[in-house]
């Protein structure tokens, strides 16, 4: 299992925390839109609260990279902000947009993000679940690489 991050300080914190658990996780410095892995390297890719920090262009590049490194039949699982389920959730998400930027978060709150996943070649794109939080709607997405 690999953990990837573009910030060496974050990787050091992760390494330190996981060393106490004697885990078999390899932490790799790299960026999601230029994954340092060969084609068909993984059966599953998981992302948590990362995509809403990326511009639409980098979201697209990242999704294409994930598609590239997944084996046929591989799965993508994403936990990130989703389409606001009601006016209260839309208002709550405004604080996230102020902090993280409107440019990078609009695809999520408006519900465009699943279509970006499809455009990268993924099939069976689903919103598996959603949760209302004090900051907005958190969605759990899944998708598959068929070929």
Q: For each predicted feature, which ranges?
A:
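A generic structural signal for alpha->beta connector loops
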Residues: 22-24, 73, 122-124
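Class I SAM-dependent methyltransferase SAM/SAH-binding core
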Residues: 1-34
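A short acidic, Gly/Pro-enriched loop at the edge of an enzyme's catalytic core
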Residues: 33-45
């Amino acid at each position: 299992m690999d953990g990837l991050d573009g910030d060496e300080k974050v990787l050091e914190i992760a390494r330190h925390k996981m060393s106490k658990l004697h885990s078999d996780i390899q932490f790799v410095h790299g960026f999601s839109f230029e994954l340092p892995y060969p084609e068909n390297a993984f059966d599953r890719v998981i992302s948590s609260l990362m995509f809403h920090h990326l511009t639409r262009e980098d979201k697209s590049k990242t999704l294409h990279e994930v598609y590239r490194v997944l084996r046929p039949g591989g799965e993508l699982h994403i936990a990130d902000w989703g389409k606001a389920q009601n006016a209260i959730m839309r208002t709550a998400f405004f604080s996230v947009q102020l902090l993280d930027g409107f440019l990078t978060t609009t695809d999520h709150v408006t519900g465009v993000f699943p279509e970006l996943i499809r455009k990268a070649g993924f099939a069976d794109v689903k919103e598996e679940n959603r949760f209302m939080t004090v900051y907005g709607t958190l969605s759990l997405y899944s998708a598959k690489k068929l070929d």
